[in-house]
From Swiss-Prot:
This is Enoyl-[acyl-carrier-protein] reductase [NADH]. The record marks 158 as: Transition state stabilizer. It is found in: Secreted, Cell wall. It catalyses: a 2,3-saturated acyl-[ACP] + NAD(+) = a (2E)-enoyl-[ACP] + NADH + H(+); a 2,3-saturated acyl-CoA + NAD(+) = a (2E)-enoyl-CoA + NADH + H(+); (2E)-octenoyl-CoA + NADH + H(+) = octanoyl-CoA + NAD(+); (2E)-dodecenoyl-CoA + NADH + H(+) = dodecanoyl-CoA + NAD(+). Its main location: secreted. The gene is inhA. Is phosphorylated in vivo. Phosphorylation on Thr-266 decreases enzymatic activity. It comes from Mycolicibacterium smegmatis (strain ATCC 700084 / mc(2)155) (Mycobacterium smegmatis).
Length: 269
């Protein structure tokens, strides 16, 4: 993918550890020639240490998508890093959260609305608020890409996060309509299960042994169903799909979901 993103400036959100999908997207984007600006939430010193493992250094900005000041100042803070008069060409939204009450073995009906609403705010509404914050400094022809997970089925242990992903898909269609007015595309990538820190914790029993077993069965079944197979320890195919959407090679694709899951979502068994 050398040169695919040459000369492009990309904002990447959501790096937490070097197992984060966002980290691998950032790595592949840099290898493809992109200049990056990164955002982190909360433990910025830790995120900075992780970001230093990327092929090239990149500025790191603080971003809590529930903080209106962070959002309202984001464009100016990005401009301060890339230079006055310059704009960005792409945005990666790799942000998701659902309180423990809304996932795992906890009964679906028992999740408090306050927890569910927080999860939907961070996982879905923030896609629109991030787009609104950065569109004024995006070049026409650019793209916004968000991370999805197939929400068309009731996934074990995923519970209200599945609902949040359904909301994200709807939000994406409206973001595409608004962003299209300034020539910017908006799409989601629905990834197969990846062994991120959060997924590893669930499989390890962080949300209960039953939830861990369910997620492990989901992972194993994914590889069996996928016509191309699926390696949950290799996020590179997902990262490449995101970078393809950030490139100039899909100029008429917007408002949709691209699957990077080995084809498992198309198969019953």
């Amino acid at each position: 993918m050398t040169g695919l993103l040459e000369g492009k400036r990309i904002l990447v959100t959501g790096i937490i550890t070097d197992s984060s999908i966002a980290f691998h997207i950032a790595k592949v984007a840099q290898e493809a020639g992109a200049e990056l600006v990164l955002t982190g939430f909360d433990r910025l010193k830790l995120v900075k240490r992780i970001a230093d493992r990327l092929p090239k250094p990149a500025p790191l900005l603080e971003l809590d998508v529930q903080n209106e000041e962070h959002l309202s100042t984001l464009a100016d803070r990005i401009t301060a890093e890339i230079g006055e008069g310059n704009k960005i060409d792409g945005v990666v939204h790799s942000i998701g959260f659902m309180p423990q009450s809304g996932m795992g073995i906890n009964p679906f009906f028992d999740a408090p609305y306050e927890d569910v609403s927080k999860g939907i705010h961070i996982s879905a509404y923030s896609y629109a608020s991030l787009a609104k914050a950065v569109l004024p400094i995006m070049n026409p022809g650019g793209g916004i890409v968000g991370m999805d997970f197939d929400p068309t089925r009731a996934m074990p242990a995923y519970n209200w996060m599945t609902v949040a992903k359904s909301a994200l898909e709807s939000v994406n269609r409206f973001v595409a309509r608004e962003a299209g007015k300034v020539g910017v595309r908006s799409n989601l990538v629905a990834a197969g299960p990846i062994r991120t820190l959060a997924m590893s914790a669930i499989v390890g029993g962080a949300l209960g042994d039953e939830a861990g077993q369910q997620m492990q069965l989901l992972e194993e079944g994914w590889d069996q169903r996928a016509p191309l197979g699926w390696n949950m320890k290799d996020p590179t195919p997902v990262a490449k799909t995101v970078c393809a959407l950030l490139s100039d090679w899909l100029p008429a694709t917007t408002g949709t979901v691209i699957y990077a899951d080995g084809g498992a979502s198309t198969q019953l068994l």
